């Protein structure tokens, strides 16, 4: 009869241990010893190549195996696991042996893998040398990005020559025309050789200061070195070439050429020959002067430079004031120190703004000008003879005048000179208004730097004095530049007219509320708002006024009355101290000094005050004489 062992009950066995036990001993778990997993000792003793632990070194870490079926030494009888108590203990021992074998096997496998990888990473020195030599001969595919983009050193020179190769290999050098084209549109630097750049620089230094096409801009001011001269080109935006006015101008400067002198605009003068030719051709709309022989531009004229400069200095300055900015043109100012052979061959574009003969006679017919040593300081004055414009406001101590706007760039003429002439009645508001209207009508460029501006309103100036002053007059350098400068360029704009306020320092200025410029800000209260620190307490009291009880109210009333009575004695002492200070020797009343008509009234007022004090305190003050109102020092026991 077959005996079936039931598994032992293990109430405190964990689920994880139970599952491991079922996997390790399936026969015991199912309650049968005759399970297909039963092994014979002879089968178990044979080495299994598929077993993971069979490849390990048996001498180093021998495996402990426990069979499931055991045979006796006599070979007749055999027994299985679990038949007796000894078999059960032997089964538990097998479990621990299996655990040890498993740990050793995993450790051996891990050690074997690490050793195999180290052998691959660290080969023998001979094998390493051999592999390196093989890699040099045979390209490695581990760096495909480097193999794709790297460049051999032999190809560097070829690539450099190819990148620096000129686009136009047939043309070795550049001519003058191509140089100017390059100045407008630069060729890439990689396409120019060293010889081309060197030749380009030499051509730029040797070119004459002739008129050239301006670059795409409204107004170009080209400044070059002293060897090339100063060139200035003003673009003509007008598309109608027939209406161009052309004028030949000459540059003059007393100072030697330097980098600092080139920063300021040079003075421009017009020769008498050019003026005569312009007057002769003033009837035509446009004309062209092809060649002008300046004395300073002739070859071998170094000896007569001083005479030619004086000749340009003694010119007619009326023509300079006639230059207008309404009609624009191209003006070129050549330098006298540069060669002008090529410049004379080309036509010089000039501006004929002197055609208009209907100029302001008040300025052209002036015969003299005021001296430069005018007072730099001016005391504001008030003149009743000065008339006001419709938009000019005035008051008893101040006046506002409308004057043309000018730029105070020099120290020779400032606004104090204008004010001094207004104070002397040489310049009035009527004359200023007439001047403003004439400029607006004729679009003329007139400013206060020209001394003739003041001569136009002075009819008592001698003509001889004007002739002497005109010889030594030197026009500001920036004046002509402002006249010729193109209005279409982007620059700072100023109003044509300005407001001038004249007032007296000794009088207070009456501000007019109707004038926005003198209007004050809104009136603000000088009282400062303070936060109420007892706002919360007061709000709570107000909310509890309707809910307070009678008993609580009486209790509060009695408390306040008790507090008032307690402080009454202190209040009595404070009142007496106040009265003693009021009628004391520290502040005596000097009745002897009061000897005027109101002395009787003053004495009676003092007596009335003392009587009122006695009524308030309920007793009579001591020390007061019945015959007079003299105050005597009070003792401490008055009250």
From Swiss-Prot:
Stretches for region Disordered: 110-143, 215-264, 352-396
One of the protein's GO biological processes: ascospore wall assembly
Residue ranges the record marks as coiled coil: none
Domain of life: Eukaryota
Extent of Basic and acidic residues compositional bias: 116-140, 220-247, 352-361
Signal peptide range: none
Biased amino acid composition, Acidic residues: 372-388
UniProt GO cellular component terms: prospore membrane; protein phosphatase type 1 complex
Single Gene Ontology MF annotation: protein phosphatase 1 binding
Quaternary structure and partners: Interacts with phosphatase 1 (GLC7).
Entry protein name: GLC7-interacting protein 1
Record gene name: GIP1
């Amino acid at each position: 009869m077959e005996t079936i062992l039931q598994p032992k009950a293990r109430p405190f066995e964990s689920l994880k241990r139970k599952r491991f036990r079922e996997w390790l001993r399936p026969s015991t778990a199912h309650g049968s010893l005759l399970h297909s997993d039963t092994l014979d000792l002879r089968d178990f003793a044979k080495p299994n190549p598929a077993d993971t632990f069979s490849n390990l070194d048996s001498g180093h870490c021998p495996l402990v195996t426990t069979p499931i079926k055991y045979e006796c030494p006599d070979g007749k009888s055999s027994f299985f696991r679990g038949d007796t108590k000894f078999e059960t203990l032997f089964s538990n021992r097998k479990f621990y042996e299996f655990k040890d074998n498993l740990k050793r096997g995993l450790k051996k496998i891990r050690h074997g893998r690490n050793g195999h990888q180290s052998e691959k990473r660290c080969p023998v020195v001979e094998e390493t040398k051999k592999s390196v030599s093989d890699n040099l001969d045979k390209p490695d595919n581990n760096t495909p990005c480097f193999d794709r983009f790297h460049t051999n050193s032999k190809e560097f020179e070829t690539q450099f020559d190819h990148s620096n190769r000129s686009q136009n290999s047939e043309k070795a050098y550049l001519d003058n025309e191509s140089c100017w084209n390059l100045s407008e549109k630069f060729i890439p630097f990689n396409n120019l050789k060293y010889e081309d750049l060197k030749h380009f620089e030499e051509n730029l230094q040797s070119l004459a200061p002739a008129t050239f096409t301006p670059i795409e801009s409204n107004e170009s001011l080209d400044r070059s070195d002293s060897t090339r001269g100063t060139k200035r080109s003003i673009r003509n935006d007008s598309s109608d070439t027939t209406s161009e006015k052309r004028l030949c101008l000459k540059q003059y400067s007393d100072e030697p050429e330097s980098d600092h002198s080139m920063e300021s605009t040079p003075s421009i003068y017009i020769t008498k020959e050019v003026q005569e030719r312009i007057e002769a051709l003033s009837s035509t709309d446009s004309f062209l002067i092809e060649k002008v022989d300046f004395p300073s531009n002739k070859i071998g004229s170094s000896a007569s430079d001083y005479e030619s400069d004086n000749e340009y200095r003694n010119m007619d300055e009326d023509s300079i004031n006639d230059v207008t900015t309404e009609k624009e043109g191209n003006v070129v100012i050549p330098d006298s120190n540069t060669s002008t052979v090529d410049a004379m061959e080309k036509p010089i574009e000039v501006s004929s703004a002197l055609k208009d003969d209907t100029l302001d006679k008040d300025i052209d017919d002036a015969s003299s000008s005021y001296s430069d040593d005018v007072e730099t300081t001016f005391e504001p004055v008030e003149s009743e003879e000065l008339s006001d414009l419709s938009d000019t406001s005035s008051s008893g101590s101040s006046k506002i005048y409308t004057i043309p706007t000018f730029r105070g760039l020099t120290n020779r003429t400032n606004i104090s000179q204008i004010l001094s002439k207004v104070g002397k009645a040489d310049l009035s508001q009527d004359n200023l208004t007439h001047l403003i209207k004439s400029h607006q009508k004729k679009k003329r460029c007139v400013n206060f730097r020209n001394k003739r501006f003041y001569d136009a309103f002075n009819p008592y100036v001698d003509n001889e004095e004007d002739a002497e002053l005109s010889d030594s007059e030197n026009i500001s350098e920036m004046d002509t530049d402002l006249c010729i400068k193109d209005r279409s360029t982007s620059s700072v704009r100023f109003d044509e007219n300005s407001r001038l306020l004249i007032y007296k320092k000794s009088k207070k200025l009456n501000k007019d509320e109707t004038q926005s410029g003198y209007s004050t800000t809104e009136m603000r209260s000088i009282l400062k708002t303070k936060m109420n620190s007892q706002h919360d307490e007061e709000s709570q009291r107000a909310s509890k006024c309707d809910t307070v009880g009678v008993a609580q109210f009486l209790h509060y009333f009695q408390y306040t009355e008790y507090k008032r009575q307690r402080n009454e004695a202190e209040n009595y002492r404070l009142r007496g101290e106040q009265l003693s200070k009021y009628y004391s020797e520290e502040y005596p009343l000097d009745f002897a000094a009061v000897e005027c008509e109101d002395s009787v009234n003053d004495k009676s007022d003092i007596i009335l005050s003392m009587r009122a004090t006695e009524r308030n305190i309920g007793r009579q003050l001591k020390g007061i004489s019945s015959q007079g109102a003299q105050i005597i020092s009070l003792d401490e026991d008055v009250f």
